[in-house]
Amino acid sequence: MSYKFETLQLHVGQEQADPATDSRAVPIYQTTSYVFHNSQHAADRFGLRDAGNIYGRLTNSTQDVLEKRIAALEGGVAALAVASGAAAISYTIEALAANGGHIVAQKTIYGGSANLLEHTLPGLGITTTFVDAHDLSAVEGAIQENTRAIYIETLGNPNSDIPDIDAIAAIAHKHNLPLVVDNTFGTPYLIRPIEHGADIVVHSATKFIGGHGTTLGGIIVDSGKYDWKKIGKFPGIAAPNPSYHGISFADAVGPAAFVTYIRAILLRDTGATISPFNAFLLLQGVETLSLRLDRHIYNTKKVIEYLSKHPKVEKVNHPSLKDHPDHALYERYFPNGGASIFTFEIKGGVKEAFKFIDNLKIFSLLANVADVKSLVIHPATTTHSQLTEEELLAAGIKNTTIRLSIGTEHVDDLIADLDQAFNA
């Protein structure tokens, strides 16, 4: 039987009560290790011939439910939960491009991801070319002989610009490259990138998946559609791996080879493991994902209407507005709405921006987004402060740019708070 999203977000991974305790809620399996039935059972687990828990750094039964649920919601074959979104992105890029690989990346991405690609990963031999994702010829033109993936976000950070995922997927696959899509801001409730050609989907589960500003976590989802053996560019996944008994992950586990490789090699060796408690908290968030997103979207629409008419606002950067350059893409990829994280330009300069932010009462000034509580920040001096002036302008960030993350409070109270801050 096929179930709707709202049912899947509650039940996948635990279709029946916990067999050991009859608990209907997913238990927190707070353990480091697991008893094997006998020596052969242990050998089969380590040889990947029998799926199941080996050691807490790699797997946990609470974590397993979270992974199965997100994989189902995204339409993937398997997922891996890790300690943070940064870990999910780092592992994904390292698995694809280690030892001299190259990435083509959308230039308007989260500042932390941009910093990882531009400054940290070159020390590991991984280079990146940043491109305007709207210029498809630039995307294709940036591909080199050693390119190993194209990397984009469903909704850019902080301005919610939207790439044409279908078109970029076609370019990636024309050159036998996997397309990696960060769907943190989109969420599988609003858009499923795998349906548009993505091969790998990553999330900072800290954001909408958790939804309450309490829990760090990251997710990597494997579409199962990329043929790692046929292409020949990824020997760590397809060829016999010397650090894991000579196993070819593509042969041993088939479509789930990518996330299995990361779990068995990168997670094993570097240990960005999600805790059972954090996996449990993220599951609580998943169970209300659709309900929260509906309210986020409703509130965002009302706030945008207010800001668009305010005399102290120079411009609102939201793809739902008809004058936004990505409006057509927004209607195509987000028919049910989206983008509750967006920016606007306040008239004046940085002084006016700081004054407005510092006078808000309900909106919290902090670096997180996608919380049930409404949030605000000045990107140029915080989240994107590592970027040069040229890089900030390329990312569409000015000294007058203010980022809002619209929560689920009553929208009348949010608008009243914005209004008093403008008038302070």
Where are these regions (language model features)?
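Conserved PLP-enzyme active-site core in the AAT-like
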Residues: 13-17, 79-310
